[in-house]
From Swiss-Prot:
Biased composition regions of type Acidic residues, renumbered to the chain: 691-700, 716-726, 775-784
Biased composition annotated in UniProt, kind: Low complexity: 704-715
Taxonomic placement: Eukaryota, Metazoa, Chordata, Craniata, Vertebrata
Record function comment: Subunit of non-clathrin- and clathrin-associated adaptor protein complex 3 (AP-3) that plays a role in protein sorting in the late-Golgi/trans-Golgi network (TGN) and/or endosomes. The AP complexes mediate both the recruitment of clathrin to membranes and the recognition of sorting signals within the cytosolic tails of transmembrane cargo molecules. AP-3 appears to be involved in the sorting of a subset of transmembrane proteins targeted to lysosomes and lysosome-related organelles.
Membrane-topology descriptor: Peripheral membrane protein
Oligomer and partners: Adaptor protein complex 3 (AP-3) is a heterotetramer composed of two large adaptins (delta-type subunit AP3D1 and beta-type subunit AP3B1 or AP3B2), a medium adaptin (mu-type subunit AP3M1 or AP3M2) and a small adaptin (sigma-type subunit APS1 or AP3S2). AP-3 associates with the BLOC-1 complex.
InterPro entries given in the database record: AP3_beta, AP3B1/2_C, AP3B_C, AP_beta, ARM-like, ARM-type_fold, Clathrin/coatomer_adapt-like_N, Clathrin_app_Ig-like_sf
Family: Belongs to the adaptor complexes large subunit family.
Organism from which the protein derives: Mus musculus
Biased composition (Basic and acidic residues): 666-677
Protein known as: AP-3 complex subunit beta-2
UniProt-annotated stretches for the region Disordered: 1-30, 666-801
Keywords, alphabetical: Cytoplasmic vesicle, Golgi apparatus, Membrane, Phosphoprotein, Protein transport, Transport
Amino acid sequence: MSAAPAYSEDKGGSAGPGEPEYGHDPASGGIFSSDYKRHDDLKEMLDTNKDSLKLEAMKRIVAMIARGKNASDLFPAVVKNVACKNIEVKKLVYVYLVRYAEEQQDLALLSISTFQRGLKDPNQLIRASALRVLSSIRVPIIVPIMMLAIKEAASDMSPYVRKTAAHAIPKLYSLDSDQKDQLIEVIEKLLADKTTLVAGSVVMAFEEVCPERIDLIHKNYRKLCNLLIDVEEWGQVVIISMLTRYARTQFLSPTQNESLLEENPEKAFYGSEEDEAKGPGSEEAATAALPARKPYVMDPDHRLLLRNTKPLLQSRSAAVVMAVAQLYFHLAPKAEVGVIAKALVRLLRSHSEVQYVVLQNVATMSIKRRGMFEPYLKSFYIRSTDPTQIKILKLEVLTNLANETNIPTVLREFQTYIRSMDKDFVAATIQAIGRCATNIGRVRDTCLNGLVQLLSNRDELVVAESVVVIKKLLQMQPAQHGEIIKHLAKLTDNIQVPMARASILWLIGEYCEHVPKIAPDVLRKMAKSFTAEEDIVKLQVINLAAKLYLTNSKQTKLLTQYVLSLAKYDQNYDIRDRARFTRQLIVPSEQGGALSRHAKKLFLAPKPAPILESSFKDRDHFQLGSLSHLLNAKATGYQELPDWPEEAPDPSVRNVEVPEWTKCSNREKRKEKEKPFYSDSEGESGPTESADSEPESESESESKSSSGSGSGESSSESDNEEEDEEKGGGSESEQSEEEDEKKKKTKKKKASEGHREGSSSEEGSDSSSSSESEVTSESEEEQVEPASWRKKTPPGSKSAPVAKEISLLDLEDFTPPSVQPVSPPMVVSTSLAADLEGLTLTDSSLVPSLLSPVSSIGRQELLHRVAGEGLSVDYAFSRQPFSGDPHMVSLHIYFSNNSETPIKGLHVGTPKLPAGISIQEFPEIESLAPGESTTTVMGINFCDSTQAANFQLCTQTRQFYVSIQPPVGELMAPVFMSENEFKKEQGKLTGMNEITEKLTLPDTCRSDHMVVQKVTATANLGRVPCGTSDEYRFAGRTLTSGSLVLLTLDARAAGAAQLTVNSEKMVIGTMLVKDVIQALTQ
């Protein structure tokens, strides 16, 4: 009767609540049901042609694995479905295969060709899963296939697949370490990846494969520091741990001058003149030492690491907080380490497991940096609900923090703890009292008296621990405490704990001259019970007998011989050896041994008092937060924390500005695709097109002319433009010839195609200058390098007339629509007089007023032609108001059909959007012929957040999942306001609504037009007039909520600058500061 439920359960049915999963198996499963019938229904469902049944079967199988049941016998039935076309089934199949591929290697190898096909699947999850399964098959014969797959995945478009490639690297390395050199090449490539999803995984692979290759980190150091705050929490832990060891090898110790600056640690960065004057006794020595030590100045990269990790102290992950804490402890100057104390104390409110690890580290830190935790002394008070291990660790911390100021409070706490029912905890408390008495002389007598009172305690363990501690304290002042020794001697009849009895006997023997009458009587009692004592007590009885024989042989000679005779035949060989050794020393032989003459010096020599130290004293040589530190033993795979270097290594190895500029310009070649988009689809926005496609001086003049509203303004701006252009052209005129040649080649290459596309959207392009036609008529598929144009400005004598001509054309063609980007609700000032008041402060304030600049993001890929089966889709932020809804961000979507068949019914499917985000779809595109391209406009309301908008691009036959994530600078629109209005609004947005950061502007970014161009390229803000030449102000409003965003850049001498952002949206303000600083300092 019981066979049925057992059989049905084996088929995959889950047990009900409270029902044992294996309850029926012992009764009948092994008798009535055969193994070949297990999971038969699941095998049948997997063999059907219906995807729904296969999906249900796979869900049940994965649920079985999650519950810990063995599903390996289903491997043949599951592996057949790896080629299933249903994406959901395929995902679950790969989940199963990852679990069992290593166990069923032969069967997994049969499907290896299917896994290889999965590596080319359009779905990124399938590609990643296929690589994960492939790396789980631990067979050396497929190592070349795995290596090839990892290399391809490292270049995959999806960061998720690249992350999986990083995970596969250590697996392959453990399978075949000979592949190390090739794997290092892949690691080097992935370290250069700028995606936060990949960073943590590749650093983990670096740590396991080649942690000694520190040269791979040099050029990626700053990038890792800047990405750190956005990496997932486990990646943050790995990166911080690696950067801690890296910093210990590349920077000087920030505490190197503290020995000379102990009186004033805050001056450690600048010099030691004051401390030299403070110590008159050691003035000569200090003077001699000073020339050898230069004043410590922290390396900027060292400061970058400390600054970027500090916010992570507020992380919700205890592991991240612990990682940052150990980094600060090992790397930060003494004056800055204190910031970690509050974060660590916060973790003490977490689970007991977290508390245990945190307290282990706090106990180590509190030995060297006691003052750091003193303000939080009460946080380490012990609760009755704490587990014993937590209590003992808190006790350790309290003992480390005890000093002459707070010792009364600490001792009162200890007095309370002694009454606890937890005996281990009470014993640890008595030891802590002994340590306090040792370390703080003025409370020694108080502690000793308290411990003596504990000798009358009913609990034998309390008495025993007190005896052990008293013995150590008496060694410091034995002559003054004869009465205590007599009191302890009386306890030998009652105390049965071996360590306590041994301690009493040692004390009586060591100070037998203070108790000459009691000591022989104690020996007599011990001789009676010698055979029943523990080994540790027997050894001390022998010692006591030897010492009394040497000092009072008349009374104790026979007793000593009796004890030694008993010990001679003891079962323990240590006791027997000690008895023979002692007899030869104290009892002179017939020959009169030389040792017996010196027996008193050997046995009765004064012994130094023991030093009661914390068990955590020497743990700081292990890296805090590591398993080795927790165990106080070197664990497998532990990497030693390097010592600080004597001389700082060359910091230039981390300088990547020059190669990064090159990469940037190469990357910006792709942006040239968007030039026809700005000139064709958005012919109205002349300033937008010009600002991105022309050289700096030309874009500046165009934006100035287009933002003006009259001929008088444009003429005055042209004068200013000529002056600016002469400055920019004069500094880089030597590069102009090379750039002219590049432009001529580009013109020849694109003349025919550019004419076709340009004429379709701009009628006025026939009369434009040669440089403008070159830019505005370029093909979408062709690429030019606008970044290099900005750097290589033509000579001022030639560029000024060209710029004027373009500005006039822009005024003629595009002036009327240029007012559109700012709608009436977004204008702060409605008073024309107020506007004019700000506009007439100075002529220079209007020069670089880019009101609708081109986004620095450029044209981005939305769907690759391989993943889209011939359909490629790009998008770009147009920075123009969306006609359907002013709260939406306007995007231009580019479709290209690269296949040989027409694509029909292009439209947006059902979007899966986070709360608040909405999409205005573009009209359906009925048909897109082979080789044809088209552009459309859609709007997305991102709800003032940088969350990605996920939706489907659908055709008649396929659906493609795509995602658009906006940079924070594209979530706002520019605002016109006067200087007075700006100051008034800024005054309302202070305190938490104000974010300020300091930065250093590079030499290439100190001119007015460069600063303005970089800021407006990063964020869609309007320039606000300003009366001072070294201050820049920009204003905008967020599109959804209309919240003001005010940006101020105060440039000072030598490139120093201060960036301030005021906004109600604190998150947007913080992200904007980060993006603008990155743009200005690149």
